[in-house]
Amino acid sequence: IVLQGTVISSADNKPIVGVSVYVEGTTIGATSDINGNYTLKVPAGTKHVTFAFLGYDTKKIAVADVELFKLVTLIEASNVMDDVVVVAFGTQKKESLVGAVQVVRPSTLKVTSSNLSTSFAGKIAGVISTQSSGEPGADGANFWIRGISTFGANKSPLLILDGVEIVSEMLNNIPPEAIESFSILRDATATALYGSRGANGVMIITTKNGRQSEKMAINVRLESGISMPTRVQDIADGVTYMENYNEALRTRTPAGETYVQHFSDEKITGTRNRLNPYVYPDNDWYSMLFKDFTVNENMNLNVRGGGTVVYYFLNASIFNENGILKKPAESKFNTNINSQKYLFQANVGAQLTRTTRVSLKMNTQLLFWHRPVEEVKDLFYYTMRANPVAFPAIYPKGSVEDLDDPIFGNAPSWDGGSTDINPYALLSRGYGQRHTQYITTTFSVDQDLDFVTKGLKVRGMVSFYNKTYAATYRSFSPYYYEMTDYTDNGDGTFDYNLQSIGTPGSSYLGPSTGRNG
């Protein structure tokens, strides 16, 4: 009896490649081709034919129902991913494990952030995740499994990617599209399998592989989004600042002592009427340094497929994230934050014989980071702390003879220092760049030894890990000047008498470098 037909999936009605069609208890069998078609010759007296494929429920059809063989529909197994857990020595059924193990579906990790660890919060039971910065390139979260379990310096969980230990920065840069399985060991099971390194728990990530006899599938995802602060602190304007300052001094002047007004009525009136921004400055430092929002982009492309021998999965991701810092008009270089990531995953496998399989997996991460030389968190702090009316952010070009460089305003600080804080000058004074590269490669051989004893397998694996790092910081000393007097020329122009204060300025961008690998 010759049986012919096509096997399709219940999910999308598309043909399934590589379905095993066989008669149980015999060597009679066939495999569906690239179009899902099969042909099977069975002897007379055969009662049932079985259809089986990984990820689908096995189906049996009675030979007597010949019409049912023309179009066979397999139903996806709803619990196939939840039932399989990746552990130290391979995969096991979840019900066979007695420890606290959680399997995370990769789809739950797909968030708008470019860092995988930021998606942990509130989605994985037992995992504590805290994000202390929103700065692009430095916004990865710190995370612990069931709290901190050791007293040593390293309190982070053990991270395993395709059988090899990795650092948390590499974990942050694994795109969810490349993840096949994500398992978390949360109790003594981790220590039993991985020794003392597993005392803080273990996260095991396995990347996708190709599939034998599968048509090439190409997936593309393009995203563009807007980032902005969730809340901006309200800051008093210069007039309110001066009036409140004077009021605070007045209420704190002891009885019997004469109250001395710090800000004169003339200065308050001039500031309110915006007579001259250099004589009566009113600096909104936050608006000078920060934008309202920024635009970010990312792209992901992956290709998956395979023939009867070789199968493959290739993934490429590009992330481009920007900060919300402005570029001062006087600056000759970019002072905003920019984080670029180029991530590549290449997995190639081959079924050399019926019992021998080889696999090569390579993960490459190229990270580029540009930022102002001043810490961004400090710049934000300075915008809240700096005096808004003591001096202008910058004086007009030409205010100091024979000086073509930017002339930043300043004044002695309230605590006796030679200069105060000028956030605008600190943003403008330099930039830093950092280039980091990670490469992890694993080569494995799996040998089926069923001919020795059923279920026996041997795996051999070698791995290579490399990190290179290079950083450059360049900065100059701003020219700080204090206004001692000014002249109103009567024609709408002014002459300012400026005096250099603090450390002498310099226009030379001095370098500072560092590298390792």
Segments from the language model and where they lie:
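Outer-membrane beta-barrel pore domains and translocons
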Residues: 221-225, 317-319, 363-365, 446, ...
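Extracellular loop and loop/strand-boundary signature of outer-membrane beta-barrel proteins
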Residues: 286-289, 329-334, 347, 426-432, ...
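Flexible loop and strand-edge segments within Gram-negative outer membrane beta-barrel domains
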Residues: 229-231, 278-317, 321-324, 335-419, ...
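Small-side-chain secondary-structure face that scaffolds active or pore-lining regions
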Residues: 319-341, 373, 434-440, 451-517
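Conserved nucleotide-sugar donor-binding subdomain of glycosyltransferases
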Residues: 420-424, 432, 438-440
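Flexible glycine-rich, low-complexity coil/linker segments exposed to the extracellular/periplasmic environment
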Residues: 231, 235-286, 386-425, 474-477, ...
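Short, small/polar-rich motifs associated with maturation and membrane association
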Residues: 1-345, 357-359
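Short, surface-exposed loop/turn segments at beta-strand-coil junctions that are enriched for proline
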Residues: 45, 448-450
